[in-house]
Amino acid sequence: MSDTQHSFGKNGLTATVSAHGAELTSLRTTSGQDLLWNAGPAWKRHSPVLFPIVGKPPENTTLNGQPVTLTQHGFARDMTFRWLERTETGCVLELEDTPETWQLFPAAFRLHLIYRMEETGLHVGYVLTNPSEDATLHASLGVHPAFMWPLNPETGRENHRLTFDTNEADHIRRISPDGLLPEAVPSPIHDRILPLQDSLFEADAIIMLDARSKGVDFTGPDGSGLRMRWEGFKDLGIWTKPGAGFLCIEPWYGYATPVGFSGDFSEKPGLLHLQPGESWEAFWSVEPV
């Protein structure tokens, strides 16, 4: 059994997870269709875990009196997780704080990822625990799966859409190199539908704070595609690089640092605040439709 990756499946749907970043690196249907982006030159990741921050951190900030030196989206995506369990239908991985992580983020944590292939699709669970006896854990966690766009390589990118499971707010937020912009702008989502086109992402990601939906269908010209669902996350990002062959659907708990924020890391908007011994759980799932 490989120490670096684990493949599993059920009912013809197969997945591969890497110990590096606990990242889902492949998701393939019974017909051999790849649902997940191949980490090609346009973006060299598949489905990174964003922890302990989503987006860019505040500049020159501290936590518990010590400097925070995180880079965008944190360090979990680039660390080696420990295998706790590997079976024919899933796996469990763990990441805990180390002297190395304390140099970047001075806090104790324990993060479990639980991958499980169910009857119709893949379920990915997250359990974040604060093992400290006396300090609150202030952190964010987000997911960043990149799905193939076009869904079917034999079709073009035209006539793909997202259909949300409920009506969303009439405004969205955007980011700049300096962080989350304060202004709300009109939403391109109407009657639950977002027709996909590259021009939507010329201003970077579509950001939905306190998103109402807990699921979305991503479909192509013939109506087939995938259904994604989630619980435990508050916010949502939709992103691609214009012209690239993928679309990221990103449930988050947290978001990029607002432009102009200069406080202590614990005061950054959007964070989880876990008391000693407390845990937070969330999941997302995806199935072909």
Residue ranges and their predicted role:
Residues A15-V17, L113-Y115, L122-S132:
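Short, well-ordered beta-strand segments enriched in hydrophobic/aromatic residues
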Residues M1-N11:
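Short, Gly/Pro- and small/polar-rich lid/capping loops
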Residues T136-H138, A146-W230:
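Active-site/ligand-binding surface loops and adjacent short beta/alpha elements
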Residues L13, H73, D78-E85, H190-P269:
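Acidic/His-leaning functional-site neighborhoods
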